[in-house]
Curated annotation (Swiss-Prot):
Statement: the UniProt record of this protein carries the keyword Signal: yes
Subcellular location: Cell outer membrane
Protein name: Outer membrane protein assembly factor BamA
Organism: Edwardsiella ictaluri (strain 93-146)
Classification via InterPro entries: Bac_surfAg_D15, BamA/TamA_POTRA, D15-like, OM_assembly_BamA, POTRA
Cellular-component GO terms for this entry: Bam protein complex
Gene Ontology biological-process annotations: Gram-negative-bacterium-type cell outer membrane assembly; protein insertion into membrane
Subunit structure: Part of the Bam complex, which is composed of the outer membrane protein BamA, and four lipoproteins BamB, BamC, BamD and BamE.
Similarity annotation: Belongs to the BamA family.
């Protein structure tokens, strides 16, 4: 029998199969070499069973079937009488996968790509796929300009037919663009055209967007930008004939040549609109109106199409089709646009669903909706819902999509997918602040209390100059119409001298309540009443304080410290505007507020205060990682009825929340102390004690940039910026004629300037802000403070 097998093997030398030429009935099937794969599993994958009459073709199919499982490197089928002997060599099992040297590609991305190719821990290793994986990864590096990159798969055998798989990367450096040539341009210079490219052969220091590192994707984007540049200026026949990318022998340099044909400029003769316009032909005609002699403009054509889709989308036509076919007349150099419109079906909203709101109740999200269930789908209302959810500040991001309801021709579901952020915190700790010294803090705050959207806070702070406690509650939807109700109780013991202010102590407590009324999507009004008790003591003879005390009927002595108690009832009113795209770390939109406060009859003081705050975000690039931020804060207050506004209600500037680079509250008028005879105390006056003023103006210009060396996972919780701050505080009641030798504190032109960098982090304990700023313009008595940081909220 052994001789028979040997003879058959020699006759069929080179084949992986040894069997007789005639068919036979299989009596038994035996496997040799199985380790990980069970016999039963192997038998299930075979087309041959015990008792079958098999032919040569059946046995060949058996080999192919076993190979197809991916479990075996080698398969042989032998015949021993009527028995089949299947000899296999199993592929090794992958015990681990590691990566080395990959700086441009993350491990997670590599694992996903390997799994897509069937390479994962615990699975059999198909060595034939490794070369294609190596080549695919190298092709990726070539596409980003790293032509010296190599990828090598290293397989290390382990006991029990296992292996370790390690991908070793040698990335090298990106090839630098040496020259970009545009051939065939006559209407525009190469410099003008290349100015719109991201890839450049010469990058000026001020151009933060340009790059000399070659990337295939960026080149494709630049070619599209070149095409759009010509099409937007009437060159309807513009074509890019060819693009050559040449590599230097050392693979370190790139030469790019772009061959173009400009053609002639064409004018728009008119727009011919046809098709199903769902009864909105008049509106569509207005959107497609062109001026006589107007140049053909590709961007305008795209804008027309988008505006038509938006128009139809507002009225429930969720999936309109707009096709534009330009008819080019080369003789007259004119273009007629033939636009065919199919509005499609009008869709109604069956359901609005929310996904990802594990904490926030559905009702909290649903009340922000402007799209109603059962009504036709309105694209504007759907987008407004997304904007309003983002504006709540409860979510890191919000996405929305419309899903067609299967089996219906005119129904959709609107699905909002949210990712919640941590809106609450409990903390007890000890910290240090540049403005407050040693600080003890305990607090519980929840901006989305139990998922209801209510804001509940209990906070306390103890530092060198302040002991503060507060309990507050705000219900943003006190009524179903969006009327908000807020209330606050507070206690504050403030030692001004320790805060670099003039000497006095104020122990105050009070409460207030506020109602807010929405006017429209972006505007709201508020009104409120409040009570505050102020207990002033340890007031040293000082011009601003003595001036106030005399206005309220007190006659303080210049030789001793004064005290005074005041009970005030206040009415507040305000207007607010908000169209920011997000509740935290906005990237677009504006926010502004105008607020006023006035004392009511029965108060010991008679004064009013007005403040205006605004901030506007202007994104520079499409993905909004580069943003310009402008901020303004204005304030003015004064007394009436012969009384002055209390000095402790003065405006201050300087510090991390105002003009950075200056010490907190240090900008503006300084304390003028008096001797016992009423003259100016020259020894104490001219120091650094700030008293503030009844008028203030602060402005800031900031460039928000991507945070370097930070992964995308943390990009949404970090923000980096460079800034320039300016601010001034002045006293309109200052009498310069009385104190001619002192600075004129009534001047608004004593503006301080600073410039620096800032880093903000939305930490689990609250916002953490670091800044480093250098004063550019300062005055005598100003204190600078280059490095500043702030944790959480300030009062």
């Amino acid at each position: 029998m052994a001789m028979k097998k040997l003879l058959l093997a020699s006759l069929l030398f080179g084949s992986a199969t040894v069997y007789g030429a005639d068919g036979f009935v299989v009596k038994n099937i035996h496997f040799e070499g199985l380790q990980r794969v069970a016999v039963g599993a192997a038998l299930l994958n075979m087309p041959v069973r015990v008792g079958d009459t098999v032919s040569d073709e059946d046995l060949s199919n058996t080999i192919r079937a076993l190979y197809a499982t991916g479990n075996f490197e080698d398969v042989r089928v032998l015949r021993d009488g009527n028995n089949l002997i299947v000899q296999v060599k199993e592929r090794p099992t992958i015990a681990s996968i590691t990566f080395s040297g990959n700086k441009s590609v993350k491990d997670e991305m590599l694992k996903q790509n390997l799994e897509a190719s069937g390479v994962r821990v615990g699975e059999a290793l198909d060595r034939t796929t490794l070369s294609s994986i190596e080549k695919g990864l190298e092709d990726f590096y070539y596409s980003v300009g790293k032509y010296n990159a190599t990828v090598k798969a290293v397989v290390t055998p382990l006991p029990r037919n296992r292996v370790d798989l390690k991908l070793v990367f040698t990335e090298g450096k990106s090839a630098q663009i040496q020259q970009i040539n545009i051939v065939g341009n006559h209407a525009f210079s190469s410099a003008e055209l290349l100015g719109h490219f991201q890839l450049r052969d010469d990058v000026p220091w001020w151009n933060l967007m340009a790059d000399r590192k070659y990337q295939k994707q960026k080149l494709a984007g630049d070619l599209e930008a070149l095409r759009s540049y010509y099409l937007d200026r009437g060159y309807a026949r513009f074509t890019i004939n060819s693009t050559q990318v040449s590599l230097t022998p050392d693979k370190k340099g790139i030469y790019i040549t772009i061959n173009i044909t400009e053609g002639d400029q064409y004018k728009l003769e008119g727009v011919d609109v046809t098709g199903n316009m769902a009864g909105y032909s008049a509106e569509i005609t207005r959107l497609t109106k062109v001026e006589p002699g107007e140049l053909y403009n590709g961007a305008k054509v795209t804008k027309m199409e988008d505006e038509i889709k938006q128009l139809l989308g507002r009225y429930g036509y969720a999936y309109p089709r707009v096709q534009t076919q330009p008819e080019i007349n080369d003789k007259d150099k004119t273009v007629i646009l033939h636009m065919n419109i199919d509005a499609g079906n009008r869709y109604y909203v069956r359901q609005i669903r929310f996904v990802g709101n594990d904490t926030s109740k559905d009702a909290v999200l649903r009340r922000e909706m402007r799209q109603m269930e059962g009504s036709w789908l309105g694209s504007d209302q759907v987008e407004q819902g997304k904007e309003r959810l983002n504006r709540t500040g409860y979510f890191e991001n919000v996405d929305v999509e419309t899903q067609r309801v299967p089996g219906t021709p005119d129904q959709v579901d609107v699905v909002y997918k949210v990712k919640e952020r941590n809106t609450g915190s409990f903390n007890f700790g000890i910290g240090y602040g540049t403005e407050s010294g040693i600080s003890f803090q305990v607090g519980v705050q929840q901006d989305n209390w139990l998922g209801t959207g209510n804001v509940v806070a209990i906070n306390g702070t103890k530092n060198d100059y302040q002991t503060y406690a507060e309990l507050s509650l705000t219900d943003p939807y006190f009524t179903v119409n969006g009327v908000s109700l807020g209330g606050r109780l507070f206690y504050n013991d403030f030692k001004a001298n320790n805060a670099d202010l003039s000497d006095y102590t104020n122990s105050s407590y009070g409460f207030d309540g506020t109602l807010g009324f929405p006017i429209n999507e972006n505007n709201s009004l508020r009104t409120g009443l409040g009570y505050v008790h102020n207990d002033l003591s340890d007031m040293q003879p000082q011009v601003a304080m003595w001036r106030y005390l005399r206005s309220v009927g007190q006659n303080p002595s210049d030789s001793e410290r004064a005290s005074y108690k005041a009970d005030d009832y206040t009415w507040t009113a305000g207007w607010a505007y908000n169209n920011l795209d997000r509740g935290f770390f906005p990237t677009a939109g504006s926010k502004a507020s105008l607020n006023g406060k006035i004392t009511l009859p029965g108060s010991d003081n008679e004064y009013y205060k007005l403040t205006f705050d605004s901030q506007s975000y202007f994104p520079i690039n499409q993905d909004r990682t580069w943003v310009v931020l402008g901020r303004t804060r204005l304030g003015y207050g004064n007394g009436f009825g012969g009384k002055e506004m209390p000095f402790y209600e003065n405006f201050y500037a300087g510090g991390s929340g105002s003009v950075r680079g200056f010490q907190s509250n240090n900008i503006g008028p300084k304390a003028v102390y008096l001797n016992s005879d009423g003259s100016v105390d020259q020894n104490k006056t001219g120091g650094n004690d700030a008293v503030g003023g009844n008028a203030m103006a602060v402005a800031s210009l900031e460039l928000i940039t991507p945070t370097p060396f930070v992964s995308e996972q943390y990009a949404n919780s970090l923000r980096t910026s460079v800034f320039m701050d300016a601010g001034t505080v002045w006293d309109t009641n200052w009498d310069q004629t009385t104190y001619p030798t002192l600075p004129d504190y009534s001047k608004a032109t004593n503006v301080r300037l600073s410039a620096g960098i800032a880093l903000q982090w939305m930490s689990p304990l609250g916002p953490l802000v670091f800044s480093y700023a250098q004063p550019v313009k300062k005055y005598e008595g100003d204190k600078s403070e280059q490095f500043q940081f702030n944790i959480g909220k300030t009062w």
